[in-house]
Amino acid sequence: MSVHISETRVVRGACPQDCPDTCAFLYHVEDGKLVEVTGDPDHPMTRGGLCVKLKDYAEHHYNPDRLLHAMKRVGPKGSGQFQRITYDEALAEIKKRWTQIIDQYGSQAIMNHCYLGNQGTLNGLTSGDAFFNRLGATIGEKCYCESGSSTAWIMTVGPTGGLDVESLAYSKYIIVWAMNMLSTNLHAWPFILEAKKNGAKIVVIDPIRTRTAKQADWHVQIRPGTDGALALGMMNVIIAEDLVDHDYVDKYTLGYDELKARAEQYPPERVASITGISVEDIRKLAREYATTQPSAIREGVALERSSGGGDAVRLVSSLPALVGAWRHVGGGAVEMPIWEFPFNFDFIQRPDWIKPGTRVVNELDLGAALTGELRLDPPLMSLLIHNSNPVSQQQNANKLIQGLKREDLFTVVSEIFMTDTARYADIILPATLQAEQYDLAVTWGHLYVMLNQPAISPPGECVPNVEMFRRLARTMGFDDDYWKMSDDELLMKMYDWNAPAMQGITLEKLKEVGWMRLNVGAPGQRTPHAEGNFKTPSGKCEFKASAAANGNFIVPVWRNGYNEMQPGDPVDSVPDYIPPVEGSDAVLAKRYPISLISPKPHAFLNSQYANESVQQRRQGEQTVVVHPNDAAARNIKNGDYIRVFNDRGSFEGKAELSTDVYEGLAVANLGYWPGLSRSGSAVNATTSSSHCNLGGAGCQSDNRVEIAIA
């Protein structure tokens, strides 16, 4: 009698999630089945560790609730009633409906809605751009997060990767600003601990005493949306006490006199009244930051999530040049190192296919577009949604749902599970998970090129996004060579493999080793702006932004590579503090006295994994963190179910009384699926569709509510 002994095959991969860490994976396969996913211990950044979100990633692939086949709606929109059809039948229906819409309304009546449910080059943020540009569709501006920060960062220092996260190990003073790193950038923390071991001081600036804040040497608790005022207050002290690196400022910055004049308007006393931080602490923070070199700032995306978020990022990004922090290894700021990668976006997105005068719609305004508020002509008559679950993740979700219910709206959703968004689809196309697809990861938190190789075959009719768009292109009659290229052929054109940063890196080598570091200097030597070399029009750090002359703009990568039809609204060349609209509205505060912020959860990745029972147990049900005094005033006890509401909508959660928030502030994590929640809604039922002052980003943290026992 023979005994079959399974051999484990190990395949190298990369995490696809919307996270700066982009962990190096090892897929363990036995008899064609994925049995385990572990971290690669040899990767210098991620070092073999996986976050709690990925602990059961192998099982995720075999969840019995996965969508495996194309489906067509047979019940009311939102009911989740579908019948199975073949993939070819789905494509035929899409062609029929799109052809009818184009004939009657024109191609701009169709729009793609996509974000970072996957962050690969082939299958991620830009995976549908070329197809929809070729189709002539309305351009959807992808502004869920980072678009405001990108505009602000580029206006100030240009498209630079800035400080290497690994170089934080050499810092002596580290500010983690608006980021709960232990939940959202876990693999950067060991470098901070290494710096701490060598004497560095760790400061966290955050409205909440988060996991990260509790591990810091000093938690500076700030009111939401007032970060720009704090940065100006720090500048005021630095300038008044002559802690400026005048040599660096004279040589490598533009607009110091104007910035100085602006900072003089924000003495610590004024800033204290705005931010809730004491005068003494503002002075202390400024002095320590300026005089303890090398000093570093890790900027979180949450900086942009209020009305003045864009200028807040500009101001925070200006601090390192003011004190000369860029001179040193471990000095400067890191926002999104993606700019170091030599993407060929002209090929990835094919903006040359965009017809002149094509309109744009910010994805955060989709509800207003669908309900007629934007008065679009032609109206939007069809959507294709992929890499996104907007019913959970988009602000002012009730308005979006109202629009998705339109019977005359033809909606196609590519998904892995029957999400709240998929329930409103007319056609569902099943998508692959990472172990089933090939891709070159887009790493936006470190400097490694990482290849993901498929370890198992896709189940059912599931296909990667890149293949879905090939099939759609053939279905719509597109005969361009682009749609005939293999994945490798596409990747060879999607990057400039001859760029200095890619020296020694080849696709064939990546297939052998999985990952390679960009040639941009070793972490212990890297000083990208020690002598200026900023990628701005002046070549300097621009306290006074040259780009402001043309008004507000969204970086083209967030809008299909399109640089026409930009917002263009006026932008102050010197950044200023812009108060939160709702947070500073005294009349609104009487009706809705609680400020609500909705940070990312610890065990979900945005809304991903929120339907997994294991992750639900780890994260727990929806809670609302409330200060004890606010709870007592409303007779709310710890553990009570409470209703959180305003004019836009409401949701329910379990009260968690804590002094981790200050009086007047409540916290409820985003990511929960409305359909799986107690009240059938989630936190984005209460958030507004308003935008921050730059880059079209949202104001999720500028939200006033009231709370009461449910």
Tell where the protein language model's regions lie, with residue ranges:
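N-terminal export/assembly segments and adjacent metallocofactor-ligating motifs
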Residues: 1-243, 265, 270, 278, ...
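Long, contiguous, secondary-structure-rich segments that constitute the structural scaffold
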Residues: 459, 464-513, 607, 612-625, ...
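Short beta-alpha connecting loops at secondary-structure transitions
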Residues: 214-222, 432-435, 447-459
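Active-site phosphate/pyrophosphate-binding segments
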Residues: 234, 254-367
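N-terminal leader/propeptide and maturation segments of large enzyme subunits in energy/redox metabolism
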Residues: 69-89, 236, 241-279, 455-546, ...
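Phosphate/diphosphate-binding loops
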Residues: 14, 400, 406-410, 414-419, ...
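Extended redox/cofactor-interaction regions of prokaryotic respiratory oxidoreductases
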Residues: 124-193, 198-204, 214, 228-232, ...
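Flexible, glycine/charged-enriched surface loops at secondary-structure junctions
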Residues: 105-109, 244-249, 296, 327-334, ...
